[in-house]
């Protein structure tokens, strides 16, 4: 009986050892990998090497220029050399990590018969009308016509002319260095119509270090897929003024044609409102000499905040909002004028704030009060108002007057208020700005994800990053090829994808879940199971070690 009991006990101990080893094997072989897999932070692969390469990206902005020579514009020996191509390239000196080079590819050729006929007409406007082709030129391209040195197409004191479309006229010269002299003139005209240091500096104002001209360069709106424009009539004294403004007709006649011409740069929505009892929030000063009130330049920044609280247009907007306010001063503070820094009245009686909008003060004619009972009827002259607002709108979009070369004649404004080459110049600037923004966003995202290892990177986030990198590369290639329209579209895609990836909410899911919290959660689960297994393994190890050391019995 004793032998049978000892055998049973030995069998039970062996069974316990095998069970402990089995549980330990299951925990190590299956449990640990399963726990590791189910608790790991999923991080999809990202193109880190390509993103780091974007910091050394060099932009080559190619402007295709077709140069058409008429008869007697250059010496006959030079005309026999046509056609040929000349490339002029220079680096734009900006304090920015991205190197930008501007490349003017000038394709020289002789004028065709219909071009000769058009350029021999009496005025440059007639020539432009005859040269209009059914098929428009590509965005970003230019055509320069070189006319005879003694041609009457331009005033005799003018050496060049910039038209409303993508065309210009330059006087030729009978000189042995004609091509070199004319080539320099063409580059000056082409730069005024496309890319200059100031245009690109304004586009990269948020990415460049502060300097003496940064404040002015930061005036234009940042690039966006859409913009909202709000026209507001502020009538602080409705008891004295019954103001009527035909804002719908004014927008239809003046603003909408301009926005239609600007449509390639983004989507636009326009609305209007009338605000009663809306005060400027600044007490104007009285000038006894002129019996009028005035706002000096130093008080203008304090005007916007009190008024902005009444507008309510930017609170729920996804896009940048431009506010244009027409303020009819109350009777007690009429007439009201805006003074410049020298104390002189501003001719337009208006001012604008960078990336916000503009305000115009509209004074009621004093004669209106003499023969009328309050409130007086006020008919707003919308032509005068829209001239001011459209000028401010151009400035806020970065469409400023170009720096013309010497003796250059600029075409008058078009009915849309925007020349075709001005739109191209805006698209150049917006493309560069978008690439800089996308590159900065991707670089910041890569640095953030590299430093914090417990941020989840989902596949859709990685997909947006890959899209953004590909779009940046495509846009840079299209810019180098002179395809402005497709380059601008690709740059917009780059910004959109990079910001979708950077601001994806899933990146924050485990950001505030440190390792000590993980231990606090998992130890109560694993400790009750792990302790018996570990103790059994230790006991088995000690018994096995003891049996190895036990000496063999000898007779």
From Swiss-Prot:
Changing residue 444 to A: No effect on function in GPI-anchor attachment to protein. Component of the glycosylphosphatidylinositol-anchor (GPI-anchor) transamidase (GPI-T) complex that catalyzes the formation of the linkage between a proprotein and a GPI-anchor and participates in GPI anchored protein biosynthesis. The chain crosses the membrane at residues 19-39, 518-532. Heteropentamer. Part of the GPI-anchor transamidase complex, consisting of PIGK, PIGT, PIGS, PIGU and GAA1. Pathway: Glycolipid biosynthesis; glycosylphosphatidylinositol-anchor biosynthesis. It is found in: Endoplasmic reticulum membrane. Belongs to the PIGS family. Disulfide bonds: none annotated. Glycans are attached at residues 267, 370. It is linked to Glycosylphosphatidylinositol biosynthesis defect 18: An autosomal recessive disorder with onset in utero or early infancy and characterized by severe global developmental delay, seizures, hypotonia, weakness, ataxia, and dysmorphic facial features. Changing residue 34 to P: In GPIBD18; partial loss of function; when tested in PIGS-knockout cells, mediates partial restoration of GPI-anchored protein expression at the cell surface. Keywords: Disease variant, Endoplasmic reticulum, Epilepsy, Glycoprotein, GPI-anchor biosynthesis, Membrane, Transmembrane, Transmembrane helix. It is a multi-pass membrane protein. It comes from Homo sapiens (Human). Changing residue 43 to A: No effect on function in GPI-anchor attachment to protein. PANTHER family: GPI TRANSAMIDASE COMPONENT PIG-S. It comes from the Eukaryota. Pfam families: PIG-S. Residues 2-18, 533-555 are cytoplasmic. A cardiolipin binds at residues 15, 18. This is GPI-anchor transamidase component PIGS. GO terms for biological process: attachment of GPI anchor to protein; GPI anchor biosynthetic process; GPI anchored protein biosynthesis. Residues 40-517 are lumenal. GO terms for cellular component: endoplasmic reticulum membrane; GPI-anchor transamidase complex; membrane.
């Amino acid at each position: 009986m004793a032998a049978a009991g000892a055998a049973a006990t030995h069998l039970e101990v062996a069974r316990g050892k095998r069970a402990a080893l089995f549980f330990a094997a299951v925990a190590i072989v299956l449990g640990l990998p399963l726990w590791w897999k189910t608790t790991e932070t999923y991080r999809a692969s990202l193109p880190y090497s390509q993103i780091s390469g974007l910091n050394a990206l060099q932009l080559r902005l190619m402007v295709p220029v077709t140069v058409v020579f008429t008869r007697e514009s250059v010496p006959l020996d030079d005309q026999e050399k046509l056609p040929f191509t000349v490339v002029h390239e220079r680096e734009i000196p900006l304090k920015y990590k991205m190197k930008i080079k501007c490349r003017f590819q000038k394709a020289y050729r002789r004028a065709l018969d219909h071009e000769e006929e058009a350029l021999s007409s009496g005025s440059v406007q007639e020539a432009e009308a005859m040269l209009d082709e059914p098929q428009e030129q590509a965005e970003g391209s230019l055509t320069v016509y070189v006319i005879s040195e003694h041609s009457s197409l331009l005033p005799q004191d003018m050496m060049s002319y910039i038209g409303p479309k993508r065309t210009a006229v330059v006087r030729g010269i009978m000189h042995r260095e004609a091509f070199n002299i004319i080539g320099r003139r063409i580059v000056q005209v082409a730069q005024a119509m496309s890319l200059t240091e100031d245009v690109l500096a304004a586009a990269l104002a948020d990415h460049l270090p502060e300097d003496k001209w940064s404040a002015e360069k930061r005036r234009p709106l940042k690039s966006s897929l859409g913009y909202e424009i709000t026209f507001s009539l502020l009538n602080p004294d409705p008891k004295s003024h019954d103001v009527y403004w035909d804002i719908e007709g004014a927008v239809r006649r003046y603003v909408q044609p301009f926005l239609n011409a600007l449509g390639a740069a983004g989507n636009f929505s326009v609305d209007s409102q009338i605000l009663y009892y809306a005060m400027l929030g600044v007490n104007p000063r009285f000038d006894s000499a002129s019996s009028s009130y005035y706002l000096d330049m130093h008080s203008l920044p304090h005007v916007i905040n009190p008024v902005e609280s009444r507008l309510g247009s930017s609170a729920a907007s996804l896009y940048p909002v431009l506010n244009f306010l027409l303020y009819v001063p109350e009777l007690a503070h009429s007439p009201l004028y805006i003074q410049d820094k020298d104390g002189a009245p501003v001719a337009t009686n208006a001012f604008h704030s960078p990336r916000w909008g503009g305000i115009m003060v509209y004074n009621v004619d004093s004669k209106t009060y003499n023969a009328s009972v309050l409130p007086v009827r006020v008919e707003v002259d919308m032509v005068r108002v829209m001239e001011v607002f459209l000028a401010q709108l151009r400035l806020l979009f970065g469409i400023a007057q170009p720096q013309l070369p010497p003796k250059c004649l600029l075409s008058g404004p078009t009915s849309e208020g925007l020349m075709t080459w001005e739109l191209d110049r805006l698209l150049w600037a917006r493309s560069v700005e978008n690439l800089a923004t996308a590159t900065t966003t991707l670089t910041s995202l890569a640095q953030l994800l590299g430093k914090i290892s417990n941020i989840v990177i989902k596949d859709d986030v990685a997909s947006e990053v890959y899209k953004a990198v590909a779009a940046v590369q495509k846009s840079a290639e299209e810019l180098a090829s002179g395809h402005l329209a497709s380059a601008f579209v690709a740059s917009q895609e780059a910004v959109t994808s990079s910001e979708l990836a950077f601001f994806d909410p899933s990146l924050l899911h485990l950001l505030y879940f440190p390792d000590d919290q993980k231990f606090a959660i998992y130890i109560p689960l694993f400790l009750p199971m792990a302790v018996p297994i570990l103790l059994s393994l230790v006991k088995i190890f000690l018994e096995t070690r003891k049996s190895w050391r036990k000496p063999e019995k000898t007779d």
